[in-house]
Each structure stands twice: as C-alpha cells, then as structure tokens.
A protein has these predicted regions:
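Acceptor/aglycone-binding surface of glycosyltransferases and processive sugar-polymer synthases
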Residues: 64-80, 89, 101-183, 217-220
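A conserved acidic beta->alpha catalytic loop
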Residues: 37-46, 97
Length: 271
C-alpha cells in the first residue's frame, strides 16, 4: 500500500525543485506524487509534465483549468488519489518544499505506528528544530492563531502548516464537500473532524507533530489584502459551520457522495 502526496501548484514554474521531487519518487516506491495545477498562468503545467515523463508510473497530474485556490486544488487531488485502491494514506505538502520530505515521512510513520486518522506538522509545537520565519510574519501568525483557537475550541498549536497526512478511511469525511474558503481550509478540516468525531474524541484520533525544519519561502501567493481580510474570513467560516451547516453526516454518506473528479469540474487528469 502507498501514500499519496498532493502538491498544489499555482505559477510555480520558477520555484519548483524538480530534481528534488523526481529524486524522491524514484527512491521511494511506497509513495505516489499527485501534482495539481491550479490554473497556472505560467509554464507550470509543462514543468509538471516534464517531471512525469521521468517517473510516469509514480507521478500523476490533475489540471484544474481555472484558478480556484489551494482548497479546491487539494480537494481535487484527494478525490483523484482516493480512486486509486493502492493508496492507503493521502496527504499534502507545499510545492516550495517549506516542509521537506524527511519531516513528511515522519508524519506518515507516526500515522502508521499510532494508528491515527490524521497527523499534521506543527511549526510551533515544542521540539521544533530549524524553523525560519521573518519577524512580521511570525507576529501576524500569532495574532491569527488566537482567532483560530476561538473558532475551533481545540488545543491545536498550528492549524495552517502545509503538511498533513490522512488515513484513507477519513478522507471522504474531510473532502466530500467543497470548502468555504480558498486558503483557510485547514481550519475547516479540523471543524469537520470535530463535528464528525465529537469534541471529546477528536484529539485522541489526531496528532500534531513538531517539524524538524520549516522555512518560509518568499513570493507568497497571499498578499497584504488577503492578510487583512483573514479575521473576517475566519468569522465567515465559523458562521457557516455553526449556524448554516448543522447537518450531521455519517461516514457511509460521505463515502457514497465522494466521487472521482469529472468533466463537469473542468478538470483534466494525467494518471
């Protein structure tokens, strides 16, 4: 059984470390890479196909024709990987490799060893090693974190780290429905887990694991306007999950509605 890794990409032509990705997948047959092109306007798609040509059986490409945000890209990748019966675990990581492969493999090892449903990286948990981040970004992150803690009501230090891995069984619950937010979908992931498992049980089924290394790479896709709007967007998420979306969904319902991407989604797949 394999672990599928989703790598969402938007205008990553000049930032993708193609050599690192190809080397990793050629050396790790127990993994499968799923790159999701989120309507890039540069030559990202061509770069992805060049990588696939070097490892055609171990790399897949999901091409979202219109830029729709990281949430949609990750969800599209999850739906595709779930259709592959040999995939036992599905995770995602950032295209800039701000979290490296060593840390991601450690997340997978913990998921298997502790039989958890979700294991996710943390840049804030005690024990983290070489974490590099500029001062203003660090201050703003702490500010946003307080809003998120209020919304979740769970003792999670870092919801927004771009490295998470899920047991196959929980994937339909997390990714069945489209996310409300384009970028803050990590918060929605934990809200969905909390609603499905209950506040009393969710923390025993998930693990927050310190990263040994995480580096903020410049040229972020989130601008100043996005940052200013974050508190309002978080409030919008809270309203949707606590006032509007109050329906309890079972695992059977989620699995029944969790279908492979189709032509109606304006998505092309190179398996």
């Amino acid at each position: 059984m394999k672990t599928g890794i989703i790598i969402p990409c938007y205008n990553e032509e000049k930032r993708l470390n193609t050599k690192a990705f190809v080397s990793f997948i050629q050396e790790h047959s127990e993994y499968h890479l799923c790159f999701v092109n989120d309507g890039s306007k540069d030559n990202t798609l061509e770069v992805l196909y060049d990588m696939k040509a070097q490892a055609p059986q171990a790399i897949s490409i999901v091409d979202v024709k219109k830029n729709s945000g990281k949430a949609t890209a990750v969800r599209a990748g999850a739906r595709f990987l779930f259709s592959m019966p040999e995939i036992a675990h599905i995770g995602f990581m950032d295209a800039d490799l701000s979290t490296d492969f060593r840390d991601f493999k450690d997340l997978v090892k913990t998921l298997k060893r502790e039989n958890k449903l979700v294991v996710f990286g943390s840049r804030n948990a005690q024990g983290s090693g070489a974490i590099e981040r500029n001062f203003m970004r660090n201050v703003f992150s702490k500010f946003v974190k307080q809003f998120i803690l209020l919304i979740l009501g769970l003792p999670i230090r870092d919801t927004q780290c771009g490295a998470k891995v899920f047991s196959r069984s929980i994937v339909p619950v997390v990714y069945e429905e489209a996310f409300v937010s384009r970028w803050l979908f990590d918060v929605e992931i934990f809200l969905r887990l909390k609603k499905f498992m209950g506040a009393a049980n969710v923390m025993s089924n998930i693990t927050e694991q310190p990263l040994m290394r995480w580096v903020h790479v410049e040229d972020s896709k989130l601008g100043m306007r996005d940052a200013i709007e974050i508190p309002g967007r978080l409030a919008h998420i809270w309203f949707n999950y606590n006032v509007i979306n109050t329906t309890d969904r079972t695992l059977a319902t989620a699995e029944a509605n969790f279908t492979l991407v189709s032509s109606e989604d304006n998505i092309a797949i190179a398996a």
